[in-house]
């Protein structure tokens, strides 16, 4: 991807993208001027988004949302490369310089083919998106969280165009559509848009982890009895995977209130207590990211 993490025994709990966007103060496109380990990464702003103006050259020399889970004392490093073109989500530090959320989040690298390695859900789950689509979706997302206003008609058109198609997989002739569908579903979630259950079922039933998670998460924006019952039955179904069940639990918790929390509490002992987590390489410093088992997810809900 062009950005590596040089952290041996340092691990952290990686935040979800929604939290990162909410807490960030600036969204910019920039060029990397230099990266010196003892100083930080100097970038030149190409353009800024939203009302928070940021121009010229600035220094990134810290992290704003870093929750360490282990440390060897070796320290953390910004390993960006000179001349890279990158989108950054930034916060201002007390020293007047700037911070990204963690060493592995809050940035999206623009590749030579003008695709962006984009994060909509979590840095563990990235998508290769055309730069035009990335800017269209992220401009709307950023404006929504910072000004409560965005071009709803344009974004809904993009979302509907992609989710009305048959769910795509990882095949060579499908992967581009898969990434667009991922961006569409996740953008709808981040913008608090409601998509009917009947339109999302095909993604939940499709044999693709990412499509399942995006659609189940998006049901968090619905508030009808049919959706609540659907989620509850999905959680009870032994054939469904633990990760997806946890997402369904969180969605049902948001829309179901105390009534469904009580129902979930009654079935928690029937659910798995195995934590599957995000998977990936055990040497990845993001292994400290908390992701509960279905049983633990219910136990962690507010009563």
Give short role names for the model-derived ranges.
Residues 149-171, 192-205, 224-236, 257-275:
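Amphipathic alpha-helical scaffolding segments comprising HEAT/armadillo-like alpha-solenoid repeats
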Residues 8-111, 187-191, 195:
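Basic, polyanion-binding surface patches
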Residues 1, 302-303:
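Short, solvent-exposed mixed-charge patches
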Residues 4-6:
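N-terminal signal peptide c-region/cleavage motif recognized by signal peptidases
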Residues 71-73, 243-246:
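Short, surface-exposed coil-to-beta transition loops
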Residues 67-172:
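Extracellular C-terminal loop/segment signatures of secreted glycoproteins
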Residues 176-177, 207-208, 239-241, 272-275:
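Short inter-helical turns and helix N-cap capping residues of alpha-solenoid HEAT/ARM repeat scaffolds
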Residues 138-149, 172-193, 212-224, 245-257, ...:
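Structural detector for internal amphipathic alpha-helices that build alpha-solenoid repeat scaffolds
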């Amino acid at each position: 991807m062009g950005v590596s993490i040089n952290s041996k025994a340092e691990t952290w709990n990686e935040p979800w993208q929604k939290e990162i966007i909410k807490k960030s103060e600036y969204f910019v496109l920039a060029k990397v001027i230099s990266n010196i380990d003892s100083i930080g990464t100097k970038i030149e702003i190409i353009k800024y988004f939203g009302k928070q103006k940021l121009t010229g050259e600035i220094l990134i020399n810290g992290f704003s949302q870093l929750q360490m889970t282990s440390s060897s004392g070796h320290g953390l490093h910004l390993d960006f490369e000179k001349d890279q073109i990158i989108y950054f989500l930034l916060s201002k530090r007390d020293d007047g310089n700037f911070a990204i959320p963690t060493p592995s989040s809050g940035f999206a690298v623009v590749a030579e083919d003008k695709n962006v390695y984009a994060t909509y859900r979590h840095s563990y789950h990235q998508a290769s998106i055309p730069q035009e689509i990335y800017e269209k979706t992220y401009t709307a997302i950023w404006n929504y969280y910072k000004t409560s206003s965005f071009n709803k008609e344009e974004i809904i058109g993009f979302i509907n165009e992609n989710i009305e198609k048959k769910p795509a997989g990882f095949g060579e002739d499908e992967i581009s559509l898969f990434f667009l569908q991922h961006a569409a579903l996740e953008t709808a979630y981040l913008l608090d848009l409601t998509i009917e259950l009947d339109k999302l079922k095909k993604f939940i039933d499709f044999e693709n982890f990412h499509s399942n998670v995006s659609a189940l998460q998006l049901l968090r924006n619905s508030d009808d009895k049919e959706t609540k019952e659907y989620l509850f039955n999905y959680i009870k179904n032994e054939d469904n995977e633990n990760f997806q069940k946890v997402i369904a639990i969180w969605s049902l918790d948001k829309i179901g209130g105390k009534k469904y929390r009580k129902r979930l509490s009654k079935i928690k002992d029937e659910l798995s207590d195995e934590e599957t987590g995000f998977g990936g390489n055990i040497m990845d410093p993001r292994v400290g990211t908390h992701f509960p088992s279905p049983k633990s997810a219910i136990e962690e809900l507010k009563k």
